[in-house]
């Protein structure tokens, strides 16, 4: 751990801890962190294969449906229509998620874009106007388009892997590695991550090569935004999307 001076937040629990899978939690230390401090993080990562996720049940628990398929009032119809176009003819939630993920990864990455104009919906601005953005935009767009398709989804925030230092055998993670991605709920497997941000390494799903590379949906539509400015959807943000 190499924190900034006076830092108390850590990116994972410093002691054994159990967190319900649908809750948001931030763990903090009760003292300052110093150079050389160490802690151990153990994570339970799914070993579900592509085929497992394609064949997963679509019977979602009520507590998941209650929280993670919500669409805000006034959500832009143009974004909802794009979701319908991208998932048309696809039967499984996994393949729908991959179709949306692939479309978003084709949008150029730019972490220095200006803020949306006053009154312009952030997702419409990202998808149809400026057509570039950073991780918060990609993740929010994917999570909301999945919800339009009736698939439980949320955004999550943390850090990318950083840079590996061969001499120390450690990864160096800084504030610049802060990142937002998408998690999709699959019964029996829980929350499974997806990476819609262009420029980030795609997530490898066991076993090896993903056999669902959008053969039926390789042609990506060019949607036409709805007439006029849609009512504002939530501004892209980090943290699990409630």
Spell out what each predicted region is.
Residues 18-22, 60-63, 77, 112, ...:
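Residue-level signal for well-ordered alpha-helical segments
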Residues 38, 62, 76-80, 94-97, ...:
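Alpha-helix initiation and N-capping motif
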Residues 50, 62-63, 69-71, 108-110, ...:
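Juxtamembrane membrane-insertion context
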């Amino acid at each position: 751990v190499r924190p900034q001076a006076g830092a108390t937040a850590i990116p994972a629990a410093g002691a054994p801890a159990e967190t319900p899978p649908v809750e948001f939690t931030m763990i903090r230390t009760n003292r300052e962190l110093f150079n050389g401090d160490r802690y151990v993080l153990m994570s339970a990562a799914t070993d579900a294969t592509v085929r497992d996720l394609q064949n997963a049940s679509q019977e979602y628990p009520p507590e998941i449906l209650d929280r993670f398929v919500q669409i805000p009032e006034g959500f832009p119809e143009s974004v909802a229509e794009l979701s319908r176009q991208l998932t048309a003819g696809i039967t499984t939630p996994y393949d729908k998620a991959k179709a949306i993920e692939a479309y978003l990864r084709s949008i150029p990455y730019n972490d220095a874009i200006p803020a949306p104009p006053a009154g312009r919906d952030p997702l419409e601005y990202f998808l149809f106007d400026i057509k570039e953005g950073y991780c918060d935009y990609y993740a929010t767009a994917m999570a909301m388009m999945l919800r339009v398709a009736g698939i439980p989804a949320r955004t999550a925030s943390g850090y990318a892997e950083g840079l590996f230092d061969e001499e120390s055998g450690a990864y160096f993670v800084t504030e610049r590695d802060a990142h937002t991605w998408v998690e999709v709920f699959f019964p029996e497997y829980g929350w499974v991550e997806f990476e819609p941000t262009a420029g980030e390494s795609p997530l490898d799903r066991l076993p090896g090569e993903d056999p669902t590379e959008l053969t039926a949906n390789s042609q990506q539509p060019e949607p036409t935004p709805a007439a006029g400015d849609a009512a504002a959807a939530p501004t892209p943000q980090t943290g699990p999307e409630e």
